[in-house]
């Protein structure tokens, strides 16, 4: 028989060994006991090869998906932990797990007056399923794609909606380069181990590249090695497996695919010279378990050195990041938001929100500010009021729609950059749509920065029936927030 103290010590050791091999070690206190027992432990057990009556990773999937799940190797047939140790580990976690989580602290809030909301309907149907959104500064148009494969552009000055493409798959990225118009299709929107995504290059005709991609959610098209030919860096988010991939054009005219990172969760990639050697490095956000920000340093021979710079708790639900010189010292700081809650641990989580990491040199970034916001998923960081500091506009796709739906969009007006003092402003625009995407730009050419929100009215998580009905009947696909700074 093990004593209580020795059993706890054994449990602590097992927790460190088995719960930090694939990602940062989470704090047991970060989830309530019922979610550990009903969701996390059964999933974790399956990944250790432990049979559990509460969870079968193959159940409910068609045979093709089952085959792909088995092929991934994520759920081994043979257990890697003895039954006695598994029981000790489970007992240890459930003993320490809290019954509930504390609520996020409330901050003083105001109604925002800096922006004037304007609804935009880009099609003839109610409801919205915008899967891609980006503002193009060169032609002053907003580009958006939906899950039905429709790509349109919108000119806010003339109110013109122009249909560009009609494809058959959900669009997750679009860009224009010397190669043509490049359209990225995700394949399966819902989590899947089956790769069905693709890239099409549109000129006079449509050419589909000969690569099947695993749920690509972003595609950076840029000439990285200064040979005048753009490369593509593709975030194949995947599911149980995935990758960060590089497509380079060969002398024969075709593309060659290289895997930069064999890991699921690639969400966004930015090209920026981070070490001052004149070459674009790749800064990448990884989600899906091992949540990190990575820098791929570009070498002279167009290879890359991997430098991990930030790692997050796997329960954070890391969703987005950007590089911003927040403190005005000439280098790039990292801003992140955490709040993806579309999984089997859905509760309001006090560690969701926005974090500011200041660049201290030599690839060291230190967290200096945290703004709590349940379900925070994306943001834009600009000087919206033109007072020489960085303000933030944040969307939450997973707010507490039952009690605080107005927190689906939050504007943080910077009052003191050094001390991180912000005026929190909200507006109840949640009835118009479920905000999934955000971008900004001077849409009306009046000299200030406006904001655009893209709606995706699918119900990922619990939402009041009256709000669902409003979304289904709404004709708001995009919501323009016109900055009122310049009349």
Q: Where are each of the predicted segments found?
A:
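Sec-dependent bacterial lipoprotein signal peptides
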Residues: 1-2
């Amino acid at each position: 028989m093990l004593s209580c103290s020795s059993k706890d010590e054994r449990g602590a050791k097992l927790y460190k060994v088995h719960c930090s091999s694939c990602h940062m070690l989470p704090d047991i206190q970060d989830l309530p006991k019922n979610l550990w027992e009903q969701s996390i432990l059964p999933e974790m057990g399956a990944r250790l090869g432990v049979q559990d009556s509460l969870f079968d990773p193959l159940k409910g999937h068609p045979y093709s998906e089952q085959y792909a799940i088995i092929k991934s190797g994520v759920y081994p047939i043979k257990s890697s932990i003895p039954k006695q140790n598994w029981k000790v580990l489970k007992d240890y976690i459930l003993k320490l797990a809290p019954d509930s989580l504390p609520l996020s602290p409330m901050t003083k809030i105001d109604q925002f007056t800096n922006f004037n909301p304007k609804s935009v309907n880009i099609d003839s149907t109610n409801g919205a399923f915008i899967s891609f959104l980006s503002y193009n500064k060169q032609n002053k148009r907003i580009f958006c794609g939906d899950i039905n494969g429709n790509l349109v552009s919108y000119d806010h000055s003339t109110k013109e909606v122009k249909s560009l493409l009609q494809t058959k798959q959900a669009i997750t990225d679009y860009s224009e380069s010397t190669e043509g118009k490049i359209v990225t299709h995700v394949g399966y929107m819902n989590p899947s181990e089956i790769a069905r995504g693709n890239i099409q290059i549109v000129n006079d005709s449509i050419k589909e590249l000969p690569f099947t991609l695993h749920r690509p959610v972003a595609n950076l098209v840029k000439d990285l090695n200064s040979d005048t030919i753009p490369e593509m860096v593709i975030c194949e988010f995947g599911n149980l497996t995935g990758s960060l991939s590089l497509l380079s054009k060969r002398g024969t005219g075709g593309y060659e695919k290289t895997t930069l990172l064999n890991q699921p969760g690639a969400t966004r990639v930015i090209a920026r010279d981070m070490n001052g050697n004149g070459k674009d490095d790749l800064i990448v956000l990884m989600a899906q378990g091992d949540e990190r920000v990575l820098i791929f340093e570009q070498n002279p021979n167009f290879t890359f050195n991997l430098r991990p710079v930030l790692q997050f708790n796997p329960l954070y639900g890391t969703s987005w990041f950007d590089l911003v010189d927040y403190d005005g010292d000439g280098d790039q700081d990292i801003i992140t938001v955490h709040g993806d809650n579309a999984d089997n641990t859905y509760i309001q989580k006090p560690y969701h929100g926005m974090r500011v990491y200041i660049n201290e040199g030599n690839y060291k970034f230190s967290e200096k500010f945290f703004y709590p916001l349940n379900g925070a998923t994306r943001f834009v960081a600009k000087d919206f009021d033109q007072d020489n500091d960085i303000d933030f506009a944040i969307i939450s796709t997973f707010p507490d729609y039952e009690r605080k739906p107005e927190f689906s969009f939050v504007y943080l007006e910077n009052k003191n950059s050094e001390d991180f003092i912000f005026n929190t402003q909200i507006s109840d625009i949640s009835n118009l749509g479920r905000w999934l995407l955000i971008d900004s730009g001077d849409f009306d050419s009046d000299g200030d920065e406006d904001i655009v929100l893209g709606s995706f009215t699918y119900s990922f998580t619990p939402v009041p029936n009256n709000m669902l009905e409003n979304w289904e009947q709404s004709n708001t696909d995009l919501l323009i927030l016109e900055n009122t700074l310049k009349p």
